[in-house]
Amino acid sequence: GLSAAQRQVIAATWKDIAGADNGAGVGKDCLIKFLSAHPQMAAVFGFSGASDPGVAALGAKVLAQIGVAVSHLGDEGKMVAQMKAVGVRHKGYGNKHIKAQYFEPLGASLLSAMEHRIGGKMNAAAKDAWAAAYADISGALISGLQS
C-alpha cells in the first residue's frame, strides 16, 4: 500500500497530470512512447503503429482508469477491486493477448509521459509515489487478468 505522504503527492500531482483533457494527452504520449520502444506491441493492440488513431482513444481510457484509481486513494480495497475488474474485462479481449510482462515497460512510458506534462513537479518524491501507485494498480489489473 501507499503511505499517507505518497497518497498526498499523487493527489496533488494528479490535478496537473489530468489537466484540462482528463489525462488524454498523457495517455496518448504514454502509448506512443511505449509503441516506439516496443514496436512489436502495436499488433497486440491491433494498431498499425504509434500513429494509429486508436492509440489516442486507448490512451484516454488508460488515463481515465488511472483517474478512477486516484479517486480511491483513501480506500485501497476499493481501488484494488476496481482495477482487478478492469483486468478481468481485459481477459475477455481474447484476441489481444495482454500479458503481465507488458505492464512494467508500459509503466515506465507512463511515468515518462506524466513527467513530460508536469515537468519539475514530477520530482523524486512524486516519481517514487507514482511508481508505487502504478505497481499497486498494475498488480491488481494483472490479478484480474490471470484470474
Curated annotation (Swiss-Prot):
Keyword Iron attributed: yes
Keyword Metal-binding found: yes
List of residues binding heme b: 90
Top-level taxon in the UniProt lineage: Eukaryota
Span of domain Globin: 1-146
Site feature (Causes a bend in the G helix) residues: 105
Molecular function terms, GO-annotated: heme binding; metal ion binding; oxygen binding; oxygen carrier activity
Membrane-traversing stretches: none
Keyword tags: Heme, Iron, Metal-binding, Oxygen transport, Transport
Entry similarity comment: Belongs to the globin family.
Further comment: X-ray crystallographic analysis indicates that the D helix is absent, Leu-58 replaces the distal His (of myoglobin E7), His-90 binds covalently to the heme iron, the F helix has several more residues than in mammalian globins, and Pro-105 (G7) causes a bend in the G helix.
Record note on quaternary structure: Monomer.
Descriptive protein name: Globin, major monomeric component
Species of the source: Glycera dibranchiata (Bloodworm)
UniProt lineage: Eukaryota, Metazoa, Spiralia, Lophotrochozoa, Annelida
